[in-house]
């Protein structure tokens, strides 16, 4: 089988396997910088729903035991919404005990990679009208397939470039030997 035939076969197999429910194991490396993330809630448009958004918090002052203030509620109005948005600081607890230097944003601890639960893409079923839509894909699947296609194209380009130079090199060697 020619190298281009092998490459085509590899491309087809690589694109078909993820659709059959066979996934590669993801290896993640964790560093001390990746141990915390910002707790972010992205608002989505739904009728008659209250939208919440996480806002950066100012440094928390240290109060004496007898002067502890009540938690304050931040209210914000977005364009195109009828009601106010309410963010309660009590719902997003900061991990200041674990990270005493992080004073400017509300942080939550990232679970360790060993406790992350990977679900099979075939078991995830979108809710609503997307169930029967053949053109609907979740973001994880799109990213995975996009990276796969990019990797195949990258390797194909390298093979094409190196095969052309190898031909020229072998031709050059033959001409010098004569």
UniProtKB/Swiss-Prot annotation:
One of its GO terms (biological process) is negative regulation of calcium-dependent cell-cell adhesion. InterPro entries: FXYD_motif, Ion-transport_regulator_FXYD. It comes from the Eukaryota. Residues 165-178 are cytoplasmic. The chain crosses the membrane at residues 146-164. Residues 22-145 are extracellular. It is found in: Cell membrane; Basolateral cell membrane. The keyword tRNA processing does not apply. It is a single-pass type I membrane protein. Regulatory subunit of the sodium/potassium-transporting ATPase which is composed of a catalytic alpha subunit, a non-catalytic beta subunit and an additional regulatory subunit. The regulatory subunit, a member of the FXYD protein family, modulates the enzymatic activity in a tissue- and isoform-specific way by changing affinities of the Na+/K+-ATPase toward Na(+), K(+) or ATP. Associates with and regulates the activity of the sodium/potassium-transporting ATPase (NKA) which catalyzes the hydrolysis of ATP coupled with the exchange of Na(+) and K(+) ions across the plasma membrane. May increase NKA activity by increasing the apparent affinity for Na(+). Involved in down-regulation of E-cadherin which results in reduced cell adhesion. Promotes metastasis. This is FXYD domain-containing ion transport regulator 5.
């Amino acid at each position: 089988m020619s190298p281009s035939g092998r490459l085509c076969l590899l491309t087809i197999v690589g694109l078909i396997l993820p659709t059959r429910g066979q996934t590669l194991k993801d290896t993640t490396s964790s560093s001390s910088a990746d141990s915390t993330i910002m707790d972010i809630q992205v608002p989505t448009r739904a009728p008659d729903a209250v939208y919440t958004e996480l806002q950066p918090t100012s440094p928390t002052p240290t109060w004496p035991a007898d002067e502890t203030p009540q938690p304050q509620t931040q209210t914000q109005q977005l364009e195109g919404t009828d009601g106010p948005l309410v963010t309660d600081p009590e719902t997003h607890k900061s991990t200041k005990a674990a990270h005493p230097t992080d004073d400017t944003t509300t942080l939550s601890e990232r679970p360790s990679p060993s406790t992350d639960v990977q679900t099979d893409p075939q078991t995830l079923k979108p809710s609503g009208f997307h169930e029967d839509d053949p053109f609907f894909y979740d973001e994880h699947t799109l990213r995975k397939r996009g990276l796969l296609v990019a990797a195949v194209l990258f390797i194909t380009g390298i093979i094409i470039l190196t095969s052309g130079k190898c031909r020229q090199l072998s031709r050059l060697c033959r001409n010098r030997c004569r």
